[in-house]
From Swiss-Prot:
InterPro entries: NA-bd_OB-fold, Ribosomal_uS12, Ribosomal_uS12_bac. It comes from Lactobacillus gasseri (strain ATCC 33323 / DSM 20243 / BCRC 14619 / CIP 102991 / JCM 1131 / KCTC 3163 / NCIMB 11718 / NCTC 13722 / AM63). The gene is rpsL. The lineage of its organism: Bacteria, Bacillati, Bacillota, Bacilli, Lactobacillales. This is Small ribosomal subunit protein uS12. One of its GO terms (cellular component) is small ribosomal subunit. Belongs to the universal ribosomal protein uS12 family. Gene3D superfamilies: Nucleic acid-binding proteins (2.40.50.140).
């Protein structure tokens, strides 16, 4: 425990927290060819690869994912939630933060029902999370 004199001289340092979704924190200025710190809740991107991957140890499945080049030129791996999807290469998608616990390196989710991504067909409950219309 520090003495009062040590606290007067140095003070307390607050811990710096790392972002859970660092790619959403920067915007690219194409005129200046520079990255600016400009945090955003979502970001648009183009799918460069769509595929499946297998989850970590206790789980077993084929999880759908897309490799996305964002509008700030950063390329990330994003999870495609829900049953079935219509994404292919060059589809324009909207991503949000949020990792998938059993897929290493997947820190983003694709928002269903936005831009080129269709909502989940025949979904009755939790529709707003999957871009499904009523009925």
């Amino acid at each position: 425990m520090p003495t009062i004199n040590q606290l007067v001289r140095k003070g307390r340092h607050s811990k710096t927290t790392k972002s859970d979704s660092p790619a959403l924190n920067y915007a690219y200025n194409s005129m200046k060819k520079k990255m600016n710190y400009n945090p955003a809740p979502q970001m648009r991107g183009v799918a460069t690869r769509v595929g499946t991957m297998t989850p970590k140890k206790p789980n077993s499945a084929l999880r759908k994912y897309a490799r996305v080049r964002l509008s700030n030129l950063i390329e990330v791996t994003a999870y495609i939630p829900g049953i079935g999807h219509n994404l292919q290469e060059h589809s324009v998608v909207l991503i949000r933060g949020g990792r998938v616990k059993d897929l290493p390196g997947v820190r983003y989710h694709i928002i269903r029902g936005a831009l080129d991504t269709a909502g989940v067909d025949g979904r009755k409950q939790g529709r707003s999370k999957y871009g499904a219309k009523k009925g």
